[in-house]
Amino acid sequence: MAWISRYSMLVVLLGLCLIFSFATLTKQQPNPPDAAEQMLQALRAVTPQRVLVISSNSREDLDFVDALRGKFETLTNKDPSWTVSFVAGTPQDARKAIDGSSSNRLTLVVSPDAQPWKLFEGLAEKFPGKELRFVAPEPVLWPSFLKSQNLINIVNQIVIIAILAIGMTLVILTGGIDLSVGSLIALSAVICTLAIRDWGGGEQADGGTILLCGLLALLVCALAGLVNGLLVVYSELPPFIATLGMMLIASGSAFLLCKGQSIAAVPDSFVWLGRGTWFGLPVAVILMAGMYVATHIVMRSTVYGRAIYAIGGNVEAARLCGIRVRTVIVTTYVLSGLLAGLGGLVMASRLKSGDATYGAMYELYVIAAVVVGGTSLRGGYGSVLGTLVGALIIAVIENGMNLIQIESYMQKVVFGLVILGAVLLDRNARVRR
């Protein structure tokens, strides 16, 4: 039965997905490719005629039009008697297109978001002399939780916490903790955007300048992590106290640098890291996934990874085995600071600005993700993949409760219960081990 304990959090994640799927089951529009196929099948049953595809400018509607355009190209190539045109925009744009049509017989294919337009009520009275046929995708029974865009949003909204949680996992595995990561988010965002504004040309900054300013912010955060590590191993300060002090220093420094004002003088290209997509997926999500894969390999297949587990299990035994305990511990804090800085860059890119208020309370969510993912607060036991599962559990709970309209105050209660439950499970597992 050891596998039950090992994969318990993954089972919890799947269970939560199942619960929220049933809770959000409702009739809704099919995804764009399915809706396009549905429309094509409906039109094949009628006499060839002129077709006008009407849509709004929403993202889902434009995806629907793109999918339908490809299918109509195949259809018109096989049967030239079909004539298809497209209009995207407002009800006024659609009316102009209908009035301007040279054909008296017209089939209107209407996208999901355009269906509620009052333009389509009483078509015969509004367009006398034209024979109009209204065709629209039929709604299907499907959970709002499992819509592809919602699933992407779940992962996308947890990216920053998940990136920080990698470094926090390494620190906690050694028996430490890092409370400064939330403030380092703000410090990183402020330093990067301030450097772009004051030294990099502001809104005219090029890609190379943005990269250098980002590296500067990462360097400062890594140095903050280095100070944390040195205080812990050489001054023998408790990690809680050392990183609490750095949290206050970083937060105060961020406010001093930006003078309490948001810094928004950055170029449009600055948002690529936080909002850009690659092969249909957010760039930040791809970055996060790559980092988790790389860290998992390091922790499972390298001497450094095994040293971290050894230190968390028994510091003295690790030292007697020849492990450079102090060096390893310091590097975990450096990595934690570096990844907190990266999280700050993602947040600044996503919001297209830097602000000293960024990252408030994030350290608690990061620690929660690590603990919920099964990493022991005493060190020596856990994994980064477990941390990813923990971060996803937090994101799924938040997203699911928003979908079923649970108020934010109750969400905090639920998060607190989840954290307490995870710690109790960790305690019981430690007793069994």
Enumerate the language-model features and the residues they cover.
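Short loop segments and helix-boundary regions at transmembrane helix junctions
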Residues: 1, 172-177, 205, 220-264, ...
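Membrane-embedded helix boundary and interhelical linker motif in transport proteins
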Residues: 52-61, 77-83, 174-176, 180-226
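Helix-loop-helix "hairpin" substructures at the membrane interface of multi-pass membrane proteins
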Residues: 210-213, 224, 280-354
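Single transmembrane alpha-helix segments in multi-pass membrane proteins
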Residues: 147-199, 230-236, 374-384, 417
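Transmembrane helix-bundle core of multi-pass membrane transporters
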Residues: 239-302, 328-331, 350-359, 406, ...
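Transmembrane alpha-helical segments in multi-pass inner-membrane proteins
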Residues: 340, 350-416
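Cytosolic-side transmembrane-helix boundaries in multi-pass membrane proteins
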Residues: 1-31, 37-41, 96, 125-129, ...
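Hydrophobic core segments of alpha-helical transmembrane domains in multi-pass membrane transport
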Residues: 10-23, 112, 167-169, 217-221, ...
